[in-house]
């Protein structure tokens, strides 16, 4: 009776990953997205500077279209590279109810939607449900395989993840078999959504977009309050 070793499992996971990647990329080349009005800042800016760095403009302007932080703005964020907190929502912080957290800026949890979903442990770690059709000016989710980030369970709050799960650097270890399974699942979900939308009637697509977007638009209040 033959026994499988850890190397066999890694090779099998790698083979599955490469097969899924080939299928995914085969359909992605012809549908390269043009993002229109969506902000084009890179992920490092979004995680560490968006609504973190103080706005340098002294003249009055529209806060909701400005990527920088302003005095009294609910969307302001603590810098995750200098303040240690996780991407888990704080149970005592409620923007709508104006409930202040008793721990203040030293709280180990995220305050508000922007701190939660722009945290390095969360940002673009899940596929966007709208996929290529996403029209949000600010979206916390990945719209293709290059945007998808894989973050380990033990990722530190101040440690950024690799820019892409398909590229590695000297400082970044290769994806583990478990990471590969997550990548494969995410790519399969993206491909399934694209295939469904390509044959669905436009009215059904619009209704589905409205239903899917509804629970995700709560962060708009963070910009307006």
UniProtKB/Swiss-Prot annotation:
Keyword entries, A-Z: DNA-binding, Metal-binding, Repeat, Zinc, Zinc-finger
Classification via PROSITE patterns: ZF_C3H1
InterPro entries named in the record: Unkempt-like, Znf_CCCH
Stretches the record annotates as Disordered: 155-210
GO MF annotation: an example: DNA binding
Segments forming C3H1-type zinc fingers: 84-114, 123-145
Protein name: Zinc finger CCCH domain-containing protein 10
Native source species: Oryza sativa subsp. japonica (Rice)
């Amino acid at each position: 009776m033959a026994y499988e070793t850890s190397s066999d499992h890694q090779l099998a996971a790698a083979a599955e990953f490469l097969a899924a990647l080939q299928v995914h990329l085969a359909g992605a080349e012809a549908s390269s997205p043009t993002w229109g009005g969506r902000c084009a800042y890179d992920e490092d800016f979004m995680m560490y500077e968006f609504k973190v760095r103080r706005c340098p403009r002294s003249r009055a302007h529209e806060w909701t279209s400005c990527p920088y932080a302003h005095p009294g703005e609910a969307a302001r964020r603590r810098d995750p590279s200098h303040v240690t907190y996780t991407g888990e929502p704080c149970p005592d912080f409620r923007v709508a109810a104006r409930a202040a957290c008793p721990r203040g800026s030293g709280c180990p949890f995220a305050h508000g939607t922007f701190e939660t979903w722009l945290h390095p442990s969360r940002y673009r770690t899940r596929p966007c449900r709208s996929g290529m059709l996403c029209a949000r000016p600010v979206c916390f989710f990945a719209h293709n395989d290059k945007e998808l980030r894989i973050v380990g369970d033990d990722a530190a709050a101040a440690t950024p993840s690799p820019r892409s799960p398909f590229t590695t650097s000297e400082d970044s270890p290769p994806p583990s078999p478990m990471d590969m399974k997550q990548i494969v699942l995410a790519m399969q979900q993206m491909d399934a959504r694209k295939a469904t939308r390509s044959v669905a009637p436009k009215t059904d697509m619009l209704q589905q977009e409205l239903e899917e977007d509804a629970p995700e638009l709560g962060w708009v209040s963070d910009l307006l309050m």
